[in-house]
Curated annotation (Swiss-Prot):
It comes from Bos taurus (Bovine). InterPro entries: Gal-3-0_sulfotransfrase, P-loop_NTPase. It is found in: Golgi apparatus, Golgi stack membrane. The gene is GAL3ST3. One of its GO terms (cellular component) is Golgi cisterna membrane. Its EC number is 2.8.2.-. It holds the Pfam family Gal-3-0_sulfotr. Transfers a sulfate to position 3 of non-reducing beta-galactosyl residues in N-glycans and core2-branched O-glycans. Has high activity towards Gal-beta-1,4-GlcNAc, Gal-beta-1,4(Fuc-alpha-1,3)GlcNAc and lower activity towards Gal-beta-1,3(Fuc-alpha-1,4)GlcNAc. GO terms for biological process: glycolipid biosynthetic process. SUPFAM superfamilies: P-loop containing nucleoside triphosphate hydrolases. Glycans are attached at N90, N109, N176, N301. Residues 1-19 are cytoplasmic. It is a single-pass type II membrane protein. The chain crosses the membrane at residues 20-40. This is Galactose-3-O-sulfotransferase 3.
Amino acid sequence: MPPIFQRLQQATKMSRRKILLLVLGCSTLSLLIHQGAQLSWYPKLFPLSCPPLQDSPPRPKHMTVAFLKTHKTAGTTVQNILFRFAERHNLTVALPHPSCEHQFCYPRNFSAHFVHPATRPPHVLASHLRFDRAELQRLMPPGTVYVTILREPAAMFESLFSYYNQYCPAFRRVPNASLEAFLRAPEAYYRAGEHFAMFAHNTLAYDLGGDNERSPRDDDAYLAGLIRQVEEVFSLVMIAEYFDESLVLLRRLLAWDLDDVLYARLNARAASSRLAAIPAALAQAARAWNALDAGLYDHFNATFWRRVASAGRACVEREARELREARERLLRRCFGDEPVLRPAAQIRTKQLQPWQPSRKVDIMGYDLPSGRAGPATEACLKLAMPEVQYSSYLLRKQKRRGGMRLRPEPVLDNPPPRPIRALRPGH
C-alpha cells in the first residue's frame, strides 16, 4: 500500500478513537448531571471514612425502623430523615389515627389501635408516642431496629418550659413565666397526675414508658432497671448535643448512605424565644428536679461515646465533618446561597410554615426560592416540611396507594383527651 494511503488509514482510526472517547465522556457527564438532579450531595467515588463494623460483605439497607420520638430533643429532624427515606424506597410509614391528631394519642400508653389502618403493616414508625414494648412489637415486623434520642436534661427542660408554657398547668402557675422561679420551688407549682404534668417532670423517663415520679435519690434500683429495659430494646440511643455523630452511627447501624441522613434543622426556636445560655445554678436545679432524666442521659451519653470509640473516633468525626459539608451544599442548593431560618410569617410556601405553640414562642422554618419547579424542588420541599404537614401528606398518599377513599374518619372508641394543638402561624 502506498505511504499516503497508510497515513490516511491511521488518521481515520485515530478519528474513530476520538469520537468514541467523546461519546463516553458525554455519557459520563450526563450520568453525573442526572445524579445531581436526584440531590446526591456526597462524592460517591470516594469511600466513607469509617471502615465496616466488622469484616463482612456489604449489607443491604435496613428497611424497618422504629424511632421513639422524644420531646424537645431534635426528634422532628430525625423523623423527617426517616419520612424521606421511606418515601424514596416506597415504604409504609405508621401514622396516627386522626382521633390522635399527629401523635399516637400521647400521653396515653401506645397501642397498635392508635395506628391508621391505611398505614399498616408499617416499615417505619417515627411519630410521638409513649413507649410500650409489647404493643410496638405487636405492630412492627420482626427484625425492626429500634432507636431513640436523648438530650441534656437542663437544656431540654428549658425548651419544654418555653414550648409548653401555655399548656402545662404547672408552668402556667409560675409568676411571669419564670423558669428560675419554677426551679427554685418546683413542688409549689407541680401536681402529679395533672393533665400534661409529664412535660414538667422527667419527660424523658415518661416517654420511655417509665414512672416519671420515681427518684433515683430514693430508689437507685428503679433507674438501673429502666436503663436495662431501654438497652434491651434500643439498638442505638442518639445524643442530641452530638447530632451529626449520632447520624453517622445511625447510618452505619442501618447500612444507609450518607445521602440518606442529610437534613435541615426543623422545629427550631428563634433566638428571642430561648435562653442563650443556662446559668450553672439553674442547670444544676433542673437536673436535680429531673434526676431520673439526668441519670438516663448520663448513662447513655457514656455508652454513646463507647460506641464512637468502638467505631473509631477519628473516622466518626471525619465522617461527621463530611456530613456537615454535604449538608451545607444541599441547603445552599435548596434554599439559596445563604440559607437562613426565618419566622413563619416570612415563609411564603404554605407547606413549609411551622405551627406555633403560642404567641410567646417563634418556631422558625425555611422557604423555597421563587420560580423553581421539578423533582429537585420537590425533594427540597420535603427536606424542610414540618411534621404536621408531612404526616398529613403521607397519610393521603398511603390511602391512595391502598385504594381507600379520602373521606371523614370514624372516631376511635374511648378517644383520648385532645392532644396539644398548635396554633396556625399568625393566629
